[in-house]
Amino acid sequence: MGACDNDFIELHSRVTADVWLARPWQCLHRTRALGTTATLAPKTLKPFEAIPQYSRNKWLKMIQILREQGQENLHLEMHQAFQELGPIFRHSAGGAQIVSVMLPEDAEKLHQVESILPRRMHLEPWVAHRELRGLRRGVFLLNGAEWRFNRLKLNPNVLSPKAVQNFVPMVDEVARDFLEALKKKVRQNARGSLTMDVQQSLFNYTIEASNFALFGERLGLLGHDLNPGSLKFIHALHSMFKSTTQLLFLPRSLTRWTSTQVWKEHFDAWDVISEYANRCIWKVHQELRLGSSQTYSGIVAALITQGALPLDAIKANSMELTAGSVDTTAIPLVMTLFELARNPDVQQALRQETLAAEASIAANPQKAMSDLPLLRAALKETLRLYPVGGFLERILNSDLVLQNYHVPAGTLVLLYLYSMGRNPAVFPRPERYMPQRWLERKRSFQHLAFGFGVRQCLGRRLAEVEMLLLLHHMLKTFQVETLRQEDVQMAYRFVLMPSSSPVLTFRPIS
């Protein structure tokens, strides 16, 4: 891992206090706090070329990726680079210059200069599938005017308070069914408790809940006997994410020769997801034509009824919402349950809150969004420590000054959430799981797991509802326990996920 000349590291925003951290490293590391406030910036603006430069052995990296070791430690490598170089550095990739930052103040600056058409990089493996199959792209893969047109039509049906009010009862039904299925498994155990790796079960829950909210159809993923079609769909989602990771960091001109089987697996997986979305939309469309229901039956039905988007655009966005709402929701649930298991005092405080709010939420499940402030804070704390996305990205539409360096328009800027969340100048005692910190004061541009501005995550509210309602029902029903006290190591596999899922014990509350 390279470092720049010391002459370049005149970072006046750095706090020099040293702290000891036990996390997130595999052993103790002495780390510096990179602060958000410090001495005044120097008067002379520094040129882009003066930004500390990070160098990587690209050939070694390419060999690792080809051997399928991939970029699993990307978040740790970048975290170490910030420790060595300061809160901003640059590197080149494929001839393009990339600037990496990790402070809330820089996130705020990115937001301030954002236009109505914020740009992000294309996710090439996904785009390649759409182009080869002649399919439209959804908002995740679009930029420019087409992105804005789609997004403005989707927001009222996916992100608005009215949309949340509509799909909350559907998600609540699935969350209650998940708890009933879990209670049944516990009753079948002679010891009166259940010890398990819960990640796949939560993966199934998020698919079931998202599918119901999108298409108004249950898949039956919460029981023991899954139908072959559901199993095929689940396998396709896993395969799509795995192959995305394998293809993401290598040029297509190379992988078309070295990874032909991976490309085939990637396209085959997307074909299954595409066929599934086609079937669901066709059924919704036919049922609506035969007789429009007066009751809400999902996001897709609402979009079709309004006629604001053509069917192929609805399909494109449904595919992306389906794919993007699974791991990104299941993993924070896993890590929240793990942190509550090894922080029983926090778990008990959340249980008291959820029991106090039980009557209001039972009468109106949407109350979970307002009556569980500590649980919402716990989810923020989980996403601080374990941000699923790892980083946010923007292609600058105009010149910008970051950390007193000039960054020209057209530069790709990466904002590393993992490093922000572990920075003791931003979050005192960052190694501690402390949901209360989010209730003590306003934290501008510090909770960015769902992005910011007009390009924030489209499925944000759906994900929040799925997590809040499941944890609400879980906390009033089970004590969650674990023997494990050491940290769970995370791996970057397109999303940041546990390298091995923690084993948890669910014990009924008498």
From Swiss-Prot:
It catalyses: a steroid + 2 reduced [adrenodoxin] + O2 + 2 H(+) = an 11beta-hydroxysteroid + 2 oxidized [adrenodoxin] + H2O; 21-hydroxyprogesterone + 2 reduced [adrenodoxin] + O2 + 2 H(+) = corticosterone + 2 oxidized [adrenodoxin] + H2O; corticosterone + 2 reduced [adrenodoxin] + O2 + 2 H(+) = 18-hydroxycorticosterone + 2 oxidized [adrenodoxin] + H2O; 18-hydroxycorticosterone + 2 reduced [adrenodoxin] + O2 + 2 H(+) = aldosterone + 2 oxidized [adrenodoxin] + 2 H2O. The keyword Transferase does not apply. Residues 1-34 form a transit peptide. Adrenal cortex. 21-hydroxyprogesterone binds at F391. Induction: A 12-fold increase was seen in the presence of a low sodium-high potassium diet. Keywords: Heme, Iron, Membrane, Metal-binding, Mitochondrion, Mitochondrion inner membrane, Monooxygenase, Oxidoreductase, Steroidogenesis, Transit peptide. One of its GO terms (biological process) is cellular response to peptide hormone stimulus. Its cofactor is heme. GO terms for molecular function: corticosterone 18-monooxygenase activity; heme binding; iron ion binding; steroid 11-beta-monooxygenase activity. Its main location: mitochondrion. Coiled coil: none annotated. It is found in: Mitochondrion inner membrane. It is a peripheral membrane protein. Its EC number is 1.14.15.5, 1.14.15.4. GO terms for cellular component: dendrite; mitochondrial inner membrane; mitochondrion. The keyword Iron applies. Heme binds at C457. Pathway: Steroid biosynthesis. It comes from the Eukaryota. Belongs to the cytochrome P450 family. A cytochrome P450 monooxygenase that catalyzes the biosynthesis of aldosterone, the main mineralocorticoid responsible for salt and water homeostasis. Catalyzes three sequential oxidative reactions of 11-deoxycorticosterone (21-hydroxyprogesterone), namely 11-beta hydroxylation, followed by two successive oxidations at C18 yielding 18-hydroxy and then 18-oxo intermediates (that do not leave the enzyme active site during the consecutive hydroxylation reactions), and end with the formation of aldosterone. This is Cytochrome P450 11B2, mitochondrial.
